[in-house]
Amino acid sequence: LFESWSGGRFDLFMKVLNTLQKEDGIAIVQVTRRMFEETSTSPDDVEHFVEFPRIMKDVKVSVLFREIEDNCYKISLRSKDDINVARVAEAFGGGGHKNAAGCRIKADFETAKKEILVKVRALT
């Protein structure tokens, strides 16, 4: 998990952490296309970023929203214990495993976040 990162990737990581929102054991972070431009990075550079918020003791589910295009997000979900985030991903046409899953949502960020939170809260 801890390899050698470029300065741009580290800058991107800091920007992503600055978007952190926590509520009810759910941590949400967001990556925008502008962040990639500002840090000269690419979507490959966000690999594992979804894992970091889950390190916090009170976080049961970590969700990363990566902007693909206007009003379209790739969602990565990670969970602890018996919380099956694959069910959340499947509700949006995605899939995965119990503790690691993903999907795509065509909506603005606030709408996408609200839709994901409804599904995640139903599991916690």
Model segments located where?
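Hydrophobic helix-and-loop "lid/oligomerization" segment in the mid-to-C-terminal part
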Residues: 1-91, 96-124
